[in-house]
Swiss-Prot record:
Name assigned to this protein: Dipeptide transport system permease protein DppB
Gene, per the UniProt record: dppB
Keyword Protein biosynthesis assigned: no
Matching InterPro entries: BPD_transp_1_N (IPR045621), MetI-like (IPR000515), MetI-like_sf (IPR035906)
Keyword Membrane found: yes
Organism: Alkalihalophilus pseudofirmus (strain ATCC BAA-2126 / JCM 17055 / OF4) (Bacillus pseudofirmus)
Length: 333
């Protein structure tokens, strides 16, 4: 297992280097002079020259890339042009907010999706099977922004059950050390604020997790049906084992392997694709952070944000690969 993990880690090195090349090249793909694009058409030649010197844009490409990699090796993502603050310090609260939202959304998607898929396969062609697969089809097809707006209208505006915006109560803000509000409030014993944080997570979490939930449900059903029709399951049934034992002890473990792939991909997609949900719910996440940087032409932030999200996506897929080898020891490639 350790040797397999080391091989997978070594294979990540060229992938990560490739990502740095792509993210670094973004600023060089801007038509015209990048410094003038950042400062605007009315900028003076001296201001443009000063910014080129500050960003190192007057150096050859390979020299700039070498300096960029040197900074990355020391944990320096650069400085925001808009706030003039180190990006490494500035980006974490936004990233933590998106991580917390993504975790909640995926917990919702996995619990509902996996169990719906299992029962649908177990009760194939029943009313539950047809209903759950219809809901899954609607979930895959439903626009996130429409679902988010309906949630706000029904549960926040009409019923008043849940908050529609933000991460916490602005009148009683949460003092966080890690940026993960639920974790921090549990550790500090502020359970009233824990519930407040969870209430703020419910609507955006469901909106963000609906599509992954539908995909996971359909994949789980398909995988379970394939496993339930295999020879070894027929043997287990012939021995008189109960349906619960057959499903959860013998079939589920093998059926989860393709589902893990979907979970890994969807988790990575949510991290980088939550911008619409974050905008509708005023969630201060990494998607909104990058979007605001695009509006302000803050290219160092754009580079760093894309690199961080891409790196997390790759690490999630590494984790899924390691889970494969744990669930099925035959997978050693």
């Amino acid at each position: 297992m350790l040797a397999y993990a080391m091989r997978r880690l070594l294979l990540l090195i060229p992938v990560l280097i490739g990502m740095t090349i792509v993210t670094f090249s973004i600023i060089h793909l801007i038509p015209g002079n990048p410094a003038q694009t950042i400062l605007g058409e009315q900028a003076s030649p001296q201001a443009i020259a000063d910014l080129e010197e500050r960003l190192g844009l007057n150096e050859p490409y390979w020299v700039q890339y070498g300096l960029y990699m040197k900074d990355l090796a020391t944990g320096d993502l650069g400085t925001s042009l808009r706030t003039n603050k180190p990006i490494m310090e500035e980006i974490w609260p936004y990233l933590a907010a998106t991580i917390e939202l993504t975790i909640f959304a995926m917990i919702f998607a996995i619990i509902i999706g996996v169990n719906a898929g299992i029962v649908s396969a177990w009760k194939q062609n029943s009313w539950f099977d047809y209903l759950s697969m219809f809901i899954a089809l609607v979930g895959v097809s439903m626009p996130i922004f429409w679902l988010a707006l309906m949630e706000q209208w029904i549960f926040a505006q009409e019923l008043g059950w849940l908050p529609a915006f933000g991460r916490d109560n602005p009148r009683d803000p949460i003092i966080s050390t890690t940026g993960l509000y639920v974790f921090d409030t549990i550790i500090s014993g502020q359970f009233d604020k824990t519930w407040e944080s969870i209430k703020h997570l419910i609507l955006p979490g469901i909106a963000l997790g609906t599509i992954p939930m539908a995909i996971i449900a359909r994949m789980t059903r398909s995988s379970m049906l394939e496993v339930l029709r295999s020879d070894y399951i027929r043997t287990v049934n012939a021995k008189g084992s109960g349906q619960g034992v057959v499903i959860y002890k013998h079939a589920l473990k093998n059926a989860l392997i393709p589902v893990l792939t979907v979970v890994g991909l969807q988790t990575g997609n949510l991290l980088g694709g939550a911008i619409l949900t974050e905008t509708i719910f005023s969630w201060p996440g990494i998607g909104r952070y990058i979007f605001e940087a695009i509006n302000y032409r803050d290219y160092p932030v754009i580079q760093s944000g894309i690199l961080v999200v891409a790196t997390i996506f790759v690490l999630i897929n590494l984790f899924v690969d390691l889970l494969y080898s744990y669930i099925d020891p035959r997978i050693k490639y």
